[in-house]
Amino acid sequence: MLTKRIIPCLDIKNGRTVKGVNFVDLRDAGDPVELAAAYAEKGADELVFLDISATEEKRKTLAKLVLDVAEQLNIPFTVGGGISSVEDVDILLKNGADKVSINSSAVKNPELINQLSEKFGSQCVVVAIDAKNINGKWTVHLVGGKVPTELDLFEWAKEVEQRGAGEILFTSMDHDGTKNGFANEALARLSEDLNIPIIASGGAGNIQHFQDTFQAGKADAALAASVFHFKEIEISDLKNQLRTAGISVRL
């Protein structure tokens, strides 16, 4: 049985970590490199960096950041946010990123998934899908959940897999930030429909929520931000409790 992965997510703006990070024991909680190293030490299995800045300098800033992080980190990390071309990905992977995450650009140009998986291998390609349950139908949204599309979550996920994605990062917009648990019914259906790993995102509030998403939601990995940043959950405690519950994790 493959071990379940715990993945902290860091939002990056102009090369700095944003969205409230409360790591008191760091000199500078805004420094993604320091945070990355701290999380790796605490037992994170992977990290995700989402770049939310929209500056012209972004590509250079991000490439430099990836290089700095890669030098400090011994666990895989994924970079996402505004990646829309083979060139973007080439730069990030050359600088040390293990995977890239694409979202809106995949919806606007689905062929990009094929191009990336053919050039770099599907293991590098994570497709992030944000969806909301509207009248019983899970609808894919873009631009951080602001713009609805006509796409059905499950149909789009199947297409993404067929086009060569290696993983899907599914965020439920209904659960994100609520701390009421993950969207386990939708996650379980994704896991049943697809053969590639599914990363659960949106809704983590306590350790039980992680246990539920691995058991009921059949997720392969769980991603969270604030519960880790604000030390509401320590990764070591989380993993110990998951193991006690019979869930296979890397300690």
Swiss-Prot record:
Record field: catalytic activity: 5-[(5-phospho-1-deoxy-D-ribulos-1-ylimino)methylamino]-1-(5-phospho-beta-D-ribosyl)imidazole-4-carboxamide + L-glutamine = D-erythro-1-(imidazol-4-yl)glycerol 3-phosphate + 5-amino-1-(5-phospho-beta-D-ribosyl)imidazole-4-carboxamide + L-glutamate + H(+)
Top-rank taxon, per record: Bacteria
Pathway terms, separated by semicolons: Amino-acid biosynthesis; L-histidine biosynthesis; L-histidine from 5-phospho-alpha-D-ribose 1-diphosphate: step 5/9
Record keyword Cell cycle present: no
GO CC, alphabetical: cytoplasm
Compartment(s) where it occurs, according to its Swiss-Prot or TrEMBL record: Cytoplasm
GO terms of molecular function: imidazoleglycerol-phosphate synthase activity; lyase activity
This enzyme's EC code(s): 4.3.2.10
Keyword Ion transport: no
Function according to Swiss-Prot or TrEMBL: IGPS catalyzes the conversion of PRFAR and glutamine to IGP, AICAR and glutamate. The HisF subunit catalyzes the cyclization activity that produces IGP and AICAR from PRFAR using the ammonia provided by the HisH subunit.
Complex formation: Heterodimer of HisH and HisF.
Protein name: Imidazole glycerol phosphate synthase subunit HisF
Natural source organism: Christiangramia forsetii (strain DSM 17595 / CGMCC 1.15422 / KT0803) (Gramella forsetii)
This protein's encoding gene: hisF
